[in-house]
């Protein structure tokens, strides 16, 4: 990998990329409020569950969309996008995916200036596609020539950091704790990337009941710091 590709991965994989990720907790807010997450070990377990779910659903969508971009199959990109969106059972998850996806597309046309990204944003605005974040990420990175494995790693990192960053504001956990959790999960992320690279949208699965139960709890919560 050359330096140019590496710095693009770092730029677009940055947890402070201006796409609104800081407004979402990926479910950990409800998990902490209900006691499902209460200390470092349970936080690590929650992140691990989220990464596994992401690999078997959004991650496969990333790979399917990336392959469609490489094959210049624009219908395939849209199919992958709807497949990701349709497997998000709760409204807050759909909101997170589509809001961040549109923000990423809007930012990227000013940064990358690639015709495929302009086309993608047009499809989102016209309602021809949902514009989920995982698929938008695949479109933006594939347009820059970044490989599918690298994009899946970016997505997995984003899932983990969204949860860990939110946890810092919601519970007694230190920066050292969250960084140690992330480091320890490296081996698991490698395995989850293998799952995602199946890339078959017919095999995508988002079945993790605890996540949907926590989402339902979050909707009715009286005090909320995050949008999900």
From Swiss-Prot:
Cellular localisation: Cytoplasm
One term of GO molecular function: nickel cation binding
GO terms under cellular component: cytoplasm
Keyword terms, alphabetized: Chaperone, Cytoplasm, Nickel insertion, Virulence
HAMAP family: UreF
Family: Belongs to the UreF family.
Name of protein: Urease accessory protein UreF
Originating organism: Yersinia enterocolitica
Taxonomic classification: Bacteria, Pseudomonadati, Pseudomonadota, Gammaproteobacteria, Enterobacterales
Gene symbol of the encoding locus: ureF
């Amino acid at each position: 990998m050359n330096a140019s590709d590496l710095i693009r991965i770092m730029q677009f994989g940055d947890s402070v990329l201006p796409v609104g990720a800081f407004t979402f907790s990926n479910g950990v807010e409800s998990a902490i409020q209900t006691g499902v997450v209460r200390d470092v070990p349970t936080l690590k377990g929650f992140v691990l569950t989220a990464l596994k779910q992401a690999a078997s659903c959004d991650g496969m969508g990333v790979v399917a969309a990336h392959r469609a971009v490489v094959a210049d199959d624009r219908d395939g990109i849209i199919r992958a996008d709807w497949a990701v969106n349709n497997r998000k059972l709760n409204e807050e998850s759909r909101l997170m995916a589509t809001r961040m996806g549109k923000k990423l597309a809007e930012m990227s046309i000013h940064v990358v200036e690639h015709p495929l990204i302009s086309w993608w944003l047009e499809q989102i605005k016209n309602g021809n596609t949902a514009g989920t974040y995982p698929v938008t990420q695949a479109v933006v990175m594939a347009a820059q020539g970044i490989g599918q494995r690298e994009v899946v790693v970016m997505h997995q990192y984003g899932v983990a950091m969204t949860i860990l960053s939110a946890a810092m504001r919601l519970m007694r956990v230190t920066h050292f704790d969250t960084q140690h959790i992330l480091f320890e999960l490296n081996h698991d992320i490698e395995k989850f990337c293998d799952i995602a690279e199946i890339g078959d949208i017919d095999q995508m699965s988002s079945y993790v009941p605890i996540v949907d139960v926590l989402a339902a709890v979050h909707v009715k919560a009286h005090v909320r710091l995050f949008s999900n």
